[in-house]
Swiss-Prot record:
Stretches for region Disordered: 32-56
Source organism of this protein record: Eremothecium gossypii (strain ATCC 10895 / CBS 109.51 / FGSC 9923 / NRRL Y-1056)
Name under which the protein is recorded: Altered inheritance of mitochondria protein 39, mitochondrial
Residue intervals passing through the bilayer: 94-114
GO cellular component entries: mitochondrial membrane
Cell location: Mitochondrion membrane
Record gene name: AIM39
Keyword Protein transport: no
Keyword Transmembrane helix: yes
């Protein structure tokens, strides 16, 4: 009797690769979501034991504690989203880096490579706006007779105070302090202010240049280029003049400006320095003085100096009833 061999089948619970990976608690690396073999495992083709040919040979279901597709799909979606965001961030950083390199390469290539190395001339690289007011340098202060400026300023102050009604009534004419002495200035400060806005930057020139430095300190870099920190004026009128000259015109062809205050040089109260180059600019010499008239009275004045003294404002500060009161005695309008 021929016995037929009976083939028995059994159900096998098969976990998907992503479900098996998340059941272990290991996070999916978003960089390799599409290349990791654990999340992209190639499934075997259907065989006799996977694809039923008779009764009882259906695909094996998942365990009762697993919900196929829910947690795994959400995790895969989050990993894909994180990968896309990282790719976009890397792309933005690459574009920004390329833009910065292009800008710096163009600026330094023109300023140093072309102007300094090829043309053998000075090149100015602007950095940030400069303060318009700054203290006098030792050289500029030595050229000014500070005692003479102070004496002229005091004379102008006495002139203005002697014409004020309140000062004449309380301190008399000629002017004297409460103890009968002649007022004297105990604080006198000089500084300079640029007429035009200025920009602080780096000035480059070729190493070994024999151009006069006028006492400036230069720093050498690798024996190729020298640099120092300086500032340059920004004049809209001069810029317009250069543009018109480039096209063959001039400001005199279009209009003529007449300023009554322009008497000496470019400006009536400019600092009288010898013109060294085209980058020199006019500066105002300003002063501030304090002249006490008594224990509770103080005169504060300020103005400008060139070959003469011009007062801008004279104030009187007094302490009355425990309060500090300010009286504007003179103001140049």
């Amino acid at each position: 009797m021929i016995r037929l061999l009976g083939l028995t089948t059994r159900r096998v619970a098969v976990r998907t690769p992503v479900t098996a990976l998340y059941s272990t608690g290991k996070p999916i690396d978003p960089k390799h979501i599409f290349t990791d073999p654990q999340t992209n495992r190639i499934r075997d083709p259907p065989n006799y034991f996977q694809k039923g040919r008779g009764r009882g040979t259906e695909d094996a279901p998942l365990p009762a504690d697993m919900h196929y597709g829910m947690g795994a799909q959400e995790a895969v979606s989050e990993a894909i989203g994180a990968s896309i965001r990282q790719q976009r961030a890397r792309k933005r950083r690459g574009i920004l880096l390329a833009l910065v390199v292009a800008v710096f390469g163009t600026v330094f290539g023109y300023s140093i490579g072309y102007r300094v190395f090829y043309k053998h001339s000075e090149s100015f690289l602007p950095l940030w706006p400069a303060k318009r007011s700054r203290p006098l340098s030792e050289k500029d202060a030595a050229n000014l007779r500070v005692a003479e400026v102070k004496r002229m300023a005091e004379f102008r102050v006495f002139e203005r105070l002697s014409m004020h009604k309140m000062i004449k009534e309380q301190f008399g004419v000629p002017l004297h302090t409460q103890d009968g002495k002649k007022p004297e200035t105990n604080v006198f400060v000089l500084w300079c202010e640029d007429q035009d806005p200025c920009i602080t930057g780096l000035l480059f020139r070729p190493s070994g240049s024999h151009a006069p430095d006028h006492g400036h300190t230069w720093h050498d870099f690798l024996g190729l280029v020298q640099w120092r920190v300086t500032h340059r004026p920004v004049s809209i009128r001069n810029a317009a003049e250069r543009v018109l000259n480039f096209i063959g015109l001039g400001t005199s062809d279009l209009f003529q400006m007449v300023d009554p205050s322009k008497v000496y040089g470019d400006f009536k109260y400019e600092f009288p320095l010898p013109k060294r180059n085209d980058n020199d600019h006019a500066m105002h010499i300003c002063f501030l003085g304090e002249m006490p008239l008594g224990p509770d009275s103080l005169v504060v004045y300020r103005g400008k100096y060139h070959v003469g003294v011009r007062l801008d404002q004279v104030d009187l500060f007094r302490r009355e009833d425990g309060k500090l009161i300010r009286y504007v005695l003179y103001k140049n309008s």
